[in-house]
Regions:
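Middle-to-C-terminal accessory/interaction subdomains
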Residues: 3-43, 50-212, 279-280, 284-297
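Beta-sandwich strand segments
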Residues: 261-275
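Solvent-exposed loop/turn segments flanking beta-strands in beta-repeat/beta-sandwich domains
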Residues: 205-225, 263
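Beta-strand-rich modules
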Residues: 244-263
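Short beta-strand segments within Ig-like beta-sandwich modules, predominantly Fibronectin type-III
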Residues: 229-236
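Exposed aromatic-hydrophobic patches
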Residues: 237-244
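An aromatic-rich alpha-helical recognition segment common to small helix-rich domains
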Residues: 200-202, 217, 252-254
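Residue-level signal for short segments within beta-strands and strand-turn junctions
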Residues: 51, 219-223, 256-258
Length: 298
């Protein structure tokens, strides 16, 4: 019954889903912790779901935090991850439960409160005190074998990472409030080829302030979009078309912009050695005219 309620957009989150299946306060505080620590790989996994015996209610429990508070480390090793739409509430827009929570005003008020309370709790003095304590326990092992083999940074960079922990929490707190101004991410469809015309389409974006949204569509032969094949701005409908290019590898990028000028990438991303290229889908036009989407499995 739960999947039916969640996927039925006419069902009430307050009167049906929250009243029976989930505790909104539990979800709000769980989300607030993930948002403040930048633990982005929690959209649909790395969470423990618990339902007490003889109960229909499910609770989210924190689990697997190995991706949290790593922004400075990724910057040092020049690896692109947890950026773009993965910052702020847009990170959870692709999950039906979280999306419907975020579309519910009463839940957003709960989440605002949870963010403020946890941000106050995770203050600079507390975090720096905890860092000093845990460092005194763990640091001697970090630089010993075999652990030393797996540390991707130097002693000096280790100091930089430690100094960046609380500022990252502070930054993530700001990202939360800013993310409501942006259009929400969306998926790009697999292009189709018909009668010499390449059809390009994508899902519509969503704006919390109900602002009008337009799209910028780009097609290129490379993921850096230096070899541009097609570009169109101010597209209102979630589709466009262009003359079919020759067989080969192509990249499509779509960005949504609202009336206030805030821009969002698509959910899709292309993976290279240095991480994610956000908002980009790769596909191939075969010699026989069929279109094959490039897929990536983690």
């Amino acid at each position: 019954a739960l999947p039916i309620f969640l996927n039925d957009e006419s069902s009430s989150m307050d009167e049906e889903v929250f009243a029976r299946y989930f505790d909104p306060e539990n979800i709000a505080y769980w989300l607030a912790f993930q948002l403040l620590t930048g633990n982005t790989d929690t959209q649909s996994r790395n969470v423990y779901l618990y339902s007490p015996q003889n109960s229909d209610c499910w609770y989210l429990l924190d689990w697997d935090n190995d991706g949290m508070l790593r922004r400075k480390e990724r910057e040092i090793i020049q690896f692109s991850d947890s950026e773009s739409w993965e910052r702020g509430v847009s990170n959870y827009w692709g999950n039906v439960l979280f999306r419907r929570c975020l579309q519910t005003e009463s839940f957003r008020q709960l989440l605002d409160t949870a963010m403020d309370e946890l941000y106050a709790y995770m203050n600079q003095d507390r975090i720096e005190s905890m860092l000093a304590h845990y460092r005194s326990v763990t640091e001697e092992y970090v630089w010993r074998m075999p652990d030393r083999l797996y540390v991707p940074i130097t002693h000096e960079q280790y100091e930089e990472v430690l100094e960046s922990i609380w500022p990252e929490i502070d930054e993530d707190y700001d990202y939360y409030w800013e993310s409501y101004h942006n259009p929400m991410p969306f998926y790009i469809g697999t292009p189709s080829l018909q009668n010499g015309v390449l059809q390009l389409s994508w899902d519509t974006s969503y704006d919390f302030n109900a602002e009008d949204i337009s799209y910028t569509v780009e097609l290129a032969r490379d993921y850096q979009f230096r070899q541009m094949v097609y570009r169109e701005e101010h597209v209102v409908l979630p589709l466009t078309q262009t003359a079919a290019p020759a067989a080969g590898q192509y990249f499509i990028r779509v960005r949504a912009t609202n009336t206030s000028g805030y821009t969002q990438d698509a959910f899709d991303y292309y993976v290279i050695d240095s991480g994610k290229v956000y908002g980009v889908k790769c596909f191939y036009i075969q010699p026989d005219g069929t279109v094959v989407e490039d897929t990536y499995e983690e």
